[in-house]
Structures are given as C-alpha cells and as structure tokens.
C-alpha cells in the first residue's frame, strides 16, 4: 500500500508541471489566434510544408508582411545588340584564357558573352563613368561640329564624274529620239563632216529636238513640246552617208580621195578654233551613226513565232529519240575500244572477296555462326 501511495504521488508531481506547460502553450496559441480545439500533432512532424515546426505554424497564422526582395537589372550599353546574339553556354576552361586576355574589362565575363570581332569590342556600361549627360548642350554642340565638316576632294571628283556621265547619256538619248522623229516624219537628211556647229541638216519647222554645245563640249538637251496632231506611221529610217550624194556612179577609190582632199582644203581655210569644233562634231556624229535604230530592232516583233512542241496527254513535252550513232563516230569508237580492253576483267562484286590461291599467311576462314565449344 505504501508503494502504491508513493507511485501516485510521483505521478501527480510529474503531471502538475506537464499540465502547467500545456496550459501555457494553450494560452499562447489562443493569444496568437490558434483555436484550442485544433489538434497539433507535434510528434508527427512532416518533412515538407508549413507544419514542420511550431515556428512555421505561428508564422502562418500571424499577419506579417514579407520583407522586400532586392531586384537587379542589367542596363545594356548605348550600342547594345539584341538578346539573340548572346549564347547561353556552360563556362569551361576555354573561358580562362578569355578572361586573362581581357584586360580592359572591369568585371568577369565569359567568352560567350562577348560580341563578334567584326562588330567591335564589347564595351561595358558603367553609369558612373559617363562624361556628360546625353541631353547636355555640349553633346549637341559636338554633333553640330561633326556635321559641318568639309567634304573631301575625292567625293567632289566622283560627283563631277557622275554628272559628266549623266549629261553624256542624256545627249545620246536625245540624239536617238531625234533620229526616230526624223525617220517617222519621212524627211531625209545626211550628216556631213564639213558642217558648222549643227549636227544634222533639218529644217527648223520640223525639228522636235535641239542640241546646243556648251563651252566644255558636252551637249545639253533642250526638248520642245510634242506636236498636237498624231504622227504618221513609221517609215524605214533614212540611210545616212558620210559622202555627198551624186547622180553619177563614182568608183569608190576616187570618191574617197576626193572627199579627203575637200576636207583637207576646208580645214586649211578655217581657223584653229573651228577645227577643234569640227573634230568634236565629227566624233559626235560618228557616235550617233553607230547607235542602232530601235525601230529596226522592234519592227519584226510581231512576226516572231514559237516552235510547237509535242506533248503527252499529261502535258509533259515528249523527248525525241536520239539517233543511233554510226560505227565511225569517235565516241562509239572510243567506247568499243575501252570495252574490248577491259573485257577480260571480272567486275563482279564478289571478286574482291575471293582469292585465287590460298596463301599460307592468310587468316583461316571462320564460319558465320562462330566457333562452338
């Protein structure tokens, strides 16, 4: 009986502090808003979730604001490229040499983050190292100074050469148009080497284009307005001759000698300035005579006919059979000779795997199924 009394006394002594601790825990949970009827399985803690410890449970019940998380943004440089130019790759030992050689960089960079050499070296962007603001008046003043730089002499020469070529092309186009108009009107004329500044002998009433010679001997084009009535149908162009017309037949040798003598006499009579202009007009007239007439080129366009091609019912063109080559054809002779030369050789696929005579040094033949023990 004494033993039973001592056991009950020990149990009460142990139970009183446990109940006291439980009361404290219940009061704390009630203070933080945890219902008393909720069973807290303290001894069955989970390895995941917010019920792993009492601290997490209390933190979930309390209306606490989460602390602010820092966010980092990478500002690209002024001449930044698109994101596609950068490659995502795992750094390797090859990046060590890249970092060691890059002495200008202020931070660590891998070789995959660098730009191409053709685009230029990659420049890091440091906002604290900007010498001035982008909207400052000093930057705008530098831009205006850079825009006001004088043009180089090479560019001026190129522009002048292009202008000269343009004027020459305009002169050629005007000459072609004038020749076509003369051929359409049915008026004949000829180009003479002994004329003055005019290049063609055309009455002023029927001329539709006028060529004027400038001091630098480049003809400029001044086109007159087109006539109101419709033009007549085109006629064959006149034949321009460098010789004066004559009714009597003249042998070619005598005509050439007479023309040369007349030109030499006229050149002696005229002053030196006129001789230069005549030479320029002679080159211009020769250039105009060398230009083909577009009417002659395009007059037979309506007569062009396509060759009929035989087609199958499906629409595919039928290929003609090749003619059998004769025995004396060089291609057939060479092919027959080659066939006769290599006819004794066996070109079968199994000839490489066969040996004519068994060699003592050759490897023994093995069966396909392998050796069986």
Curated annotation (Swiss-Prot):
May play a role in mitochondrial aerobic respiration essentially in the testis. Can also promote mitochondrial fission. InterPro entries: Mtfr1 (IPR007972). Residues 275-287, 297-310 have a biased composition (Basic and acidic residues). The gene is Mtfr2. The modification Phosphoserine is found at residues 136, 312, 348. This is Mitochondrial fission regulator 2. Residues 189-331, 346-373 are annotated as: Disordered. It comes from Rattus norvegicus (Rat). Residues 224-239 have a biased composition (Pro residues). Keywords: Coiled coil, Mitochondrion, Phosphoprotein. Residues 151-179 form a coiled coil. Residues 354-373 have a biased composition (Polar residues). It is found in: Mitochondrion. Belongs to the MTFR1 family. GO terms for biological process: aerobic respiration; mitochondrial fission; mitochondrion organization. One of its GO terms (cellular component) is mitochondrion.
């Amino acid at each position: 009986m004494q033993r039973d009394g001592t056991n009950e006394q020990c149990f009460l002594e142990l139970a009183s502090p446990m109940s006291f601790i439980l009361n404290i825990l219940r009061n704390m949970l009630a203070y933080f808003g945890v219902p008393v009827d909720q069973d807290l399985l303290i001894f069955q803690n989970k390895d995941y979730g917010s019920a792993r410890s009492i601290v997490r449970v209390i933190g979930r019940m309390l209306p606490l604001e989460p602390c602010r998380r820092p966010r980092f943004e990478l500002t690209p440089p002024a001449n930044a490229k698109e994101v596609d130019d950068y490659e995502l790759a795992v750094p390797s030992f090859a990046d060590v040499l890249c970092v060691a050689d890059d002495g200008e960089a202020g931070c660590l960079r891998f070789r995959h983050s660098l730009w191409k050499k053709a685009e230029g070296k990659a420049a890091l962007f440091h906002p604290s190292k900007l010498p001035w603001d982008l909207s400052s008046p000093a930057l705008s003043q530098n831009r205006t100074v850079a825009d006001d730089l004088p043009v180089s002499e090479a560019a001026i020469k190129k522009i002048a050469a292009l202008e000269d070529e343009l004027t020459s092309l305009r002169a050629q186009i005007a000459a072609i148009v004038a020749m076509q108009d003369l051929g359409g009107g049915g008026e004949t004329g000829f180009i003479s080497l002994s004329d003055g500044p005019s290049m063609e002998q055309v009455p002023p009433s029927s001329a539709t284009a006028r060529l004027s010679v400038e001091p630098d001997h480049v003809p400029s084009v001044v086109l007159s307005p087109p006539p109101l009535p419709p033009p007549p149908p085109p006629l064959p162009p006149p034949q321009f001759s460098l010789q004066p017309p004559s009714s009597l037949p003249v042998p070619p040798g005598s005509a050439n000698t007479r023309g040369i003598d007349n030109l030499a006499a006229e050149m002696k009579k005229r002053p030196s300035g006129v001789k230069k202009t005549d030479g320029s007009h002679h080159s211009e007239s020769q250039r105009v005579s060398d230009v083909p007439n577009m009417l002659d080129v395009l007059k037979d366009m309506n007569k062009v006919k396509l060759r009929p091609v035989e087609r199958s019912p499906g629409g595919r063109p039928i290929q003609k059979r090749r003619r059998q080559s004769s025995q004396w054809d060089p291609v057939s002779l060479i092919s027959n000779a080659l066939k006769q030369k290599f006819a004794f050789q066996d070109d079968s696929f199994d000839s490489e795997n066969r040996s004519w005579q068994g060699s003592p040094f050759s490897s023994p033949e093995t069966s396909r199924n392998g050796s069986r023990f």
